From Swiss-Prot:
Gene: murQ
Domain of life per record: Bacteria
BP term (GO), one: amino sugar catabolic process
Organism this protein belongs to: Bacillus cytotoxicus (strain DSM 22905 / CIP 110041 / 391-98 / NVH 391-98)
Family designation: Belongs to the GCKR-like family. MurNAc-6-P etherase subfamily.
Subunit note: Homodimer.
CDD domains: SIS_Etherase (cd05007)
Other remarks on this protein: A lyase-type mechanism (elimination/hydration) is suggested for the cleavage of the lactyl ether bond of MurNAc 6-phosphate, with the formation of an alpha,beta-unsaturated aldehyde intermediate with (E)-stereochemistry, followed by the syn addition of water to give product.
Described purpose of this protein according to its UniProt entry: Specifically catalyzes the cleavage of the D-lactyl ether substituent of MurNAc 6-phosphate, producing GlcNAc 6-phosphate and D-lactate.
Domain SIS: 54-217
Stated name of the protein: N-acetylmuramic acid 6-phosphate etherase
Keyword DNA-binding applies: no
Cited InterPro entries: Etherase_MurQ, Glucokinase_regulatory_CS, MURQ/GCKR, SIS_dom, SIS_dom_sf
Lyase keyword on record: yes
One Pfam family cited in the UniProt record for this chain: GKRP_SIS_N
């Protein structure tokens, strides 16, 4: 029942929300938001377990799949679509699914989140298998679409995890690893796009970033697999080469082009004074880790 969910409680600090000044509303929201990172920190051990599973999936040719409805689904898609430009992943390696399909990203699809079968169809459509990791996201922890997806993921032998914002969440019973970030009552009663959504975004940031570090997508704290899909990212790529090798802009630009705009290869070429082909071989032998290639 909804009344048992802490995300549905009324916030005692905002009972007169409609009478507050704009500044008071903003102060109240900011005060509540400060609690989110603390709540996330309490789940760190569980988040670490998820990251280890995701890294294992990636190392064995598997994928990371997010499933959710409404805000939760949108956050999963948001995290997934940022992976190719940031980490140079194939667009199939990290995917997000939302109840009702992509049209539900911008407009609510009535009844979609209440159907377990829709999630099963979505996961069958990508030939989900035992190499993959599926993460179900739902603030309530009881959305049927997400529950259906987790059941099917377990059935095919995939690794499963859940992210909810209520303790004792129903979907935690279906996931091999469960994260329950208890964010409590929202400023606006039941509006889980607020603190609950913020908590989910923080957890997803951790999972994708730490997992990508674990498969060699980062050198020091530089995104060395960045894809230069626009002029801003072209310039960022050159700056990354400069930071990693301490060469000037002109030399970084020259090696960037010599390396066919492959930032990792350019860094290895400069630091080891080798040719492009040799740099690629060293990176291959090092499974993509720049530090190991050096």
């Amino acid at each position: 029942m909804l009344e048992r969910l802490s995300t549905e409680y009324r916030n005692k600090n905002t009972m007169n929300l409609d009478e507050m000044s704009i500044k008071e509303v903003l102060e109240a929201m900011n005060q509540e938001d400060r609690k989110v990172a603390i709540a996330v920190h309490k789940e760190m051990e569980q988040i670490e377990k998820i990251v280890r599973n995701v890294i294992s999936s990636f190392q064995n040719g598997g994928r990371l799949i997010y499933i959710g409805a409404g805000t939760s689904g949108r956050l999963g898609i948001l995290d997934a679509v940022e992976c190719p430009p940031t980490f140079g992943t194939d667009e199939r390696q990290v995917q997000g699914f939302i109840a009702g399909g992509m049209k539900a990203f911008t407009k609510a699809v009535e009844g979609a989140e209440d159907c377990e079968e829709l999630a099963i169809e979505d996961l069958k459509g990508i030939q989900l298998n035992d190499k993959d990791t599926v993460i179900g996201i739902a603030a309530s922890g009881r959305t049927p679409y997400v529950i259906g997806g987790l059941k099917y993921a377990n059935y095919v032998g995939a690794k499963t995890a859940s992210i909810s914002c209520n303790k004792g969440a129903e979907m935690s019973q279906l996931a091999q690893v469960s994260v329950e970030v208890e964010t409590g009552a929202e400023v606006l009663t039941g509006s889980t796009r607020l603190k609950a959504g913020t908590a989910q975004k923080l957890v997803l940031n951790m999972i994708s970033t730490a997992s990508m570090i674990g498969i060699g997508k980062v050198y020091k704290n530089l995104m060395v697999d960045v894809q230069s899909t626009n002029q801003k990212l072209v310039e960022r790529s050159k700056r990354i080469i400069m930071e990693a090798t301490e060469v000037d802009y002109k030399e970084a630009e020259a090696y960037y082009e010599k390396a066919n705009r492959n930032v990792k290869a350019a860094i290895v070429m400069i630091l080891l004074q080798c040719e492009y082909g040799e740099a690629l071989e060293k990176l291959k032998d090092a499974k993509g880790f720049v530090k190991k290639a050096l």
